[in-house]
Amino acid sequence: MGARIGVIGLGRIGRYHARNLLTTDGVDALVVTDVDARRTPDVASELDVASAADPDPPLASGIDGVLIAASSSSHADLIEAAVRRDIPTFCEKPVADSIESSVRVLATAEQTSVPVQIGFQRRFDPSFVAAYDAVRSGELGWIH
């Protein structure tokens, strides 16, 4: 049986992620929600997936993971709510809208073994390029 994933935030990026999740092996179902009450049913209908009126029901409904693409100001609270329910979490950047909130999220996450990933790719960062080149050249040996 595949995973049931919650998607919170259905703007451009949230919709993009939801569409990709629907074609991902191992994902059987999505539950989508957005703070815009009109957007949620429209996107749910468009994608033919379940919906919820607000983020709490998906987090309380036995989902296997959550993808947060909501407004930046809501990230910290949503990450913490998911982690406290032992739900593996992927959140678009930024992790929070302040240093204090970021520290709070980190402290909450460190109290559990729940995976949390922030979608902050650095593909063209010089340090990443150097690490990528080292892996590709075999300089670091076999990476798994």
What kind of feature is each model-predicted range?
Residues 1-47:
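N-terminal Rossmann-like dinucleotide-binding module
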Residues 6-8, 90, 117:
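Conserved hydrophobic packing residues within short motifs/helices of P-loop NTPase cores
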Residues 11-13, 71-74, 122-124:
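Short beta->alpha connector loops
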Residues 17, 47-108:
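Beta-loop-alpha module in the N-terminal Rossmann-like domain of NAD(P)-dependent dehydrogenases
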Residues 31, 65, 115:
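Short, Asp-centered acidic motifs that coordinate Mg2+ and/or phosphate
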Residues 40, 75-76, 128:
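Short, well-ordered alpha-helical microsegments
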